[in-house]
Amino acid sequence: MLHVWLSGALIAMSGAGAFQAPDPAVASIKGTFDLVKGNILKAAAQVPDDLYAFKPTPDVRSLGALFGHIADANFMICAAASGEKPTMSGIEKEKTAKKDLVAALEASFKFCESAFAGMTGARANETIKFMLPGTHTRLGVLAFNNAHDFEHYGNVVTYMRLKGLVPPSSQK
């Protein structure tokens, strides 16, 4: 009798907390996010402390400011996508030390991870107001964040190459 009861209980519980595969579109955008996140974090760790102040020309951001800008944007954009309040801001203007910028980058990517964690297929397709004209889906905003991160990773790659460093995406 116990065997029958346990079998019934297991069958009943199997539907309650059943694993749901992630939405394919969300999983695709998340995979791209993981790629750019890894490259940026590796680059931030790889660059020596003294190069964080490096500017190829006086009128562009320093390498450290680029990392701060990426962190600020991650918080702002992923906050828009998730509907959550950003936990940090002002990083580009307030932080210059490598350890502080690496910590801020890590925190910003963790914040974006939480935006992805709550992104079901239905939620991903909800339209929201964003800083760009028109309306955008939550997932579209996360895709925009990926594009923004890749844009500035490209800047980081150029700065690294100018200083004779091989960026993470080119390392074997």
Task: Identify the role of each PLM range.
Residues K30, D34, G38-L41, L51-G90, ...:
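Short, contiguous alpha-helical
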Residues P22-D23, I29-G31, K95, L101:
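Short leucine-rich amphipathic alpha-helices used at interfaces
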Residues H3-G15:
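Bacterial N-terminal signal peptides
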Residues M13-A27:
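Cleaved targeting-peptide boundary
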Residues A43, K95-K129, H136-H152:
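Acidic/histidine-rich alpha-helical segments that form the ligand environment
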